[in-house]
């Protein structure tokens, strides 16, 4: 099982990815993790990436694809893999295609923007323990206070509504076009094209999981 999960930030991709990797016994491949590992191991690509990052630059798609190809040669990828947060752009998807990286499915988890803003901007955390709450879905017993210590809860900068809206805007501009890219490739009837499936990411976690596994069986 070789797949990509697409969807906006806050769509629940991380939660669903964990179910998929466990079920199919495949690794979740994150470009961030790969970059850190390559830099730490001092591989040729890692050294190249480190130079760019130390200079405050963005690591090129060429280096990223090289890292992906190296990673896919490792034995734990024999049964497949799940790409996490990659590809993010059309040039990356093109490079992946040109490199002959095989894919069985591309699944889009669709969640309306208003739902995502409510999900993310409603999160509150207790910094010392990491306990998390949600003002609507999992509220503390006393508004704004941790259940255990009674200490104030905070909203992380990442969860502020303006930050969430900015992240969604970046997704719409950069990553959303991938949905059309993979959907049209699948429709073109190319035998190498992955199957494209869209599921709703709204509802209970187990319901979304059931939809996802149904999509991967069709």
UniProtKB/Swiss-Prot annotation:
Reactions performed catalytically: AMP + ATP = 2 ADP
Pathway: Purine metabolism; AMP biosynthesis via salvage pathway; AMP from ADP: step 1/1
Database matches in CDD domains: ADK (cd01428)
Keyword match Nucleotide-binding: yes
Group of enzyme by EC: transferase
PROSITE patterns attached to this UniProt entry: ADENYLATE_KINASE
EC number(s) reported in the record: 2.7.4.3
Residue numbers spanned by region LID: 122-159
UniProt-annotated binding residues for ATP: 10-15, 123, 132-133, 203
Keywords, sorted A to Z: ATP-binding, Cytoplasm, Kinase, Nucleotide biosynthesis, Nucleotide-binding, Transferase
GO biological process terms on file: AMP salvage
Pfam family, one: ADK
Compartments it resides in: Cytoplasm
Classification via SUPFAM superfamilies: P-loop containing nucleoside triphosphate hydrolases (SSF52540)
Binding site for AMP: 31, 36, 57-59, 85-88, 92, 156, 167
Domain notes: Consists of three domains, a large central CORE domain and two small peripheral domains, NMPbind and LID, which undergo movements during catalysis. The LID domain closes over the site of phosphoryl transfer upon ATP binding. Assembling and dissambling the active center during each catalytic cycle provides an effective means to prevent ATP hydrolysis.
Protein family per UniProt: Belongs to the adenylate kinase family.
UniProt-listed HAMAP family: Adenylate_kinase_Adk (MF_00235)
Free-text function comment from the UniProt entry: Catalyzes the reversible transfer of the terminal phosphate group between ATP and AMP. Plays an important role in cellular energy homeostasis and in adenine nucleotide metabolism.
PANTHER family in the record: NUCLEOTIDE KINASE (PTHR23359)
Known partners and oligomeric status: Monomer.
Designated name of the protein: Adenylate kinase
Organism from which the protein derives: Bordetella petrii (strain ATCC BAA-461 / DSM 12804 / CCUG 43448)
């Amino acid at each position: 099982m070789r797949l990509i999960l697409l969807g906006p930030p806050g769509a629940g991709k991380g939660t669903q990815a964990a179910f998929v990797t466990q079920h199919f016994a495949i690794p979740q491949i994150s470009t961030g993790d790969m970059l850190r590992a390559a830099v730490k191991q001092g591989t040729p690509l890692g050294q190249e990436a480190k130079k760019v990052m130390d200079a405050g630059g963005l690591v090129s798609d060429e280096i990223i694809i090289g890292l992906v190809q190296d990673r896919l040669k490792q034995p734990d990828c024999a049964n497949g893999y799940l790409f996490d947060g990659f590809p993010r752009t059309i040039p990356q998807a093109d490079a992946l295609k040109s490199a002959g990286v095989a894919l069985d499915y591309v699944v889009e988890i669709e969640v309306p923007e208003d739902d995502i803003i409510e999900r993310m901007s409603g999160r509150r955390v207790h910094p010392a323990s990491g306990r998390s709450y949600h003002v609507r879905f999992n509220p503390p017993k006393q508004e704004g206070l941790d259940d255990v210590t009674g200490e104030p809860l905070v909203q992380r900068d990442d969860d502020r509504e303006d930050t969430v809206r900015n992240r969604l805007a970046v997704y719409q501009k950069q990553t959303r076009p991938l949905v059309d890219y993979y959907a049209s490739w699948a429709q073109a009837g190319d035998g190498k094209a992955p199957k494209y499936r869209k599921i709703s990411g709204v509802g209970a976690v187990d319901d979304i999981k059931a939809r996802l596994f149904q999509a991967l069986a069709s």
